[in-house]
């Protein structure tokens, strides 16, 4: 079933901030920036209700270690998918990233970039 474009929802920003906090806590040993990108990041813009989240990894040699942690919290690595320097991860379930609260998360695309 196709994902339909919806009016802007301010909850998208809140959901991103919560995701960012969880990811920051899990990845605190890495030099990273986490950014909300794409149409859901632009206030007032209609969008598909799927967040786009970029993790900018400053040390490319740490990708394998970072991937292990992302997989541990429920993400599945999908590789570069034809875009060199950008690695895609998908949620294994609506509870990804896995936390002690078993929170159900907004659908999102997660990318690790250099």
Please state what every model-predicted region is.
Residues 1-48, 56-114:
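Catalytic core of pol beta-like nucleotidyltransferases
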